[in-house]
């Protein structure tokens, strides 16, 4: 077990070094030798884990995508646990993809660099496509379940709403990143939250009936220990 953990940690270190190089100098600056130097490893050790530069880049793209995904999943779980309205949960999810601070700005730089390379690299394109698909699925699932609980009107198409909201989010992310002075001083930043709120309000127009009942009802008996819960956007209401 310790040896496996060590191997995974080294792979993470290499992926982190790739991301550092992209953030500082761009994707074209990434070489196996520079990655090894940035990670504090020998070239031979890096090549032990990744036979080619393309393998190394693919792993780095998967790693940064997984890190963003983990934060999104945590936002959803937190929304379920605290019974937040679906629109609020989705706003929190979508802001994880927008470069509103230094860390997310670096992530955006890395993911967009890989997305550009993905135009001619099918393996990278698959990672990019999967990340976009999962986001749309999250939004569509929230809309679908919002229809069941009363937060979304019956005639709203979850798939169409997901495409619209994902497009708004991606556009805002690009506008924020383009600001030359960085996210903290960006003139676009003050508009991000109001614009997301306005777009989400078009879809999530109602109030959760279940939450309304729970606030009106007397306290219930505790849940049976061991009962399962499904941490998805739909169960936030």
What are these regions (language model features)?
Residues 69, 103-112, 122-149, 160, ...:
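Amphipathic alpha-helical packing segments from all-alpha helical-bundle domains
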Residues 59, 70-107, 158-165, 189, ...:
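Hydrophobic alpha-helical connector segments
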Residues 94-102, 109-120, 194-195, 199:
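Helix-loop "lid/cap" segments that line or gate small-molecule binding pockets
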């Amino acid at each position: 077990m310790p040896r496996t953990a060590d191997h995974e940690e080294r792979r993470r270190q290499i992926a982190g070094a790739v991301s550092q190089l992209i953030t500082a100098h761009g994707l074209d600056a990434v070489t196996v030798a520079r990655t090894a130097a940035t990670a504090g490893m020998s070239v031979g050790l890096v090549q032990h884990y990744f036979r080619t530069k393309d393998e190394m880049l693919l792993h780095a793209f998967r790693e940064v995508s997984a890190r963003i995904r983990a934060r999104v999943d945590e936002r959803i779980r937190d929304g379920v646990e605290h019974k937040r309205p679906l629109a609020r949960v989705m706003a929190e999810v979508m802001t994880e993809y927008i470069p509103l601070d230094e860390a997310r700005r670096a992530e955006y730089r890395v993911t967009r660099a890989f997305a550009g390379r993905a135009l001619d690299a099918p393996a990278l394109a698959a990672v990019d496509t999967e990340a976009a698909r999962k986001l749309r699925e999250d939004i569509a699932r929230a809309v679908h379940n919002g229809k069941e609980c009363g937060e979304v009107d019956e005639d709203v198409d979850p798939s169409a709403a997901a495409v619209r909201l994902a497009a708004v989010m991606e556009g805002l992310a690009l506008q924020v990143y383009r600001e030359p002075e960085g996210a903290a001083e960006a003139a676009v930043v003050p508009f991000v939250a109001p614009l997301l709120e306005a777009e989400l309000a078009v879809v999530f127009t109602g109030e959760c009936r279940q939450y309304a009942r729970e606030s009106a009802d007397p306290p219930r008996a505790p849940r049976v220990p061991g009962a399962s819960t499904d941490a998805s956007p739909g169960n936030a209401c």
